Amino acid sequence: EIVRLEKEEIPAILTAAETGDGLGGRQESFHKHTKIRDSAIIALFLGTGIRNSELVGLNTDDVDFSNNSFVVTRKGGNRVILYFNDEVGGFLRDYYEQRLANKAASPDDKALFLSLQNSRITTRAVQNIVKKYSGVAAPLKKITPHKLRSTFGTQLYRNTGDIYVVADVLGHKDVNTTKKHYAAITDDIRRKAAVEISITDSEKNK
């Protein structure tokens, strides 16, 4: 079974990143310095299905707000365009503007996401960010960046019913990998499809 966030937990983890509610001690004191960055990271995972390694590899010039897109380097070195909606774009733009205004960062460092030491953020640091806020939103689940990716994949599959689209967006080379991961949702998709089919004049029956 896929471990993922449920619908009500998705806004909860974003709220935790934005507000810091539920954090304690050092986490709470650092939150004001990291909340814009952390919110953008959580939003990107939930809204695009990006991999942790792809996220930390992003550079400032990989983002194109005019097309709501960014370029990631996939396994094997392939460069692929991913798209985000306006909601995700809002979080990303807020951080992007903060990042460009950061005078402490080296002008030669093109990394999009920076640590508090103003160097490219690490995958371990991103794991800890996700762990921190998911501990508030879903304390009984062990949520990782990959689980947020699974959450996105689940949402996309439920919305499209198209396993091939999900495989393509997630960057799975073999669609059978995707089918295996999301097999449990297939029955729900079929059930929803059956409900959508009308065999009479629905307008007349209203």
Predicted regions and their residues:
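Conserved catalytic core of the tyrosine transesterase superfamily
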Residues: 1-206
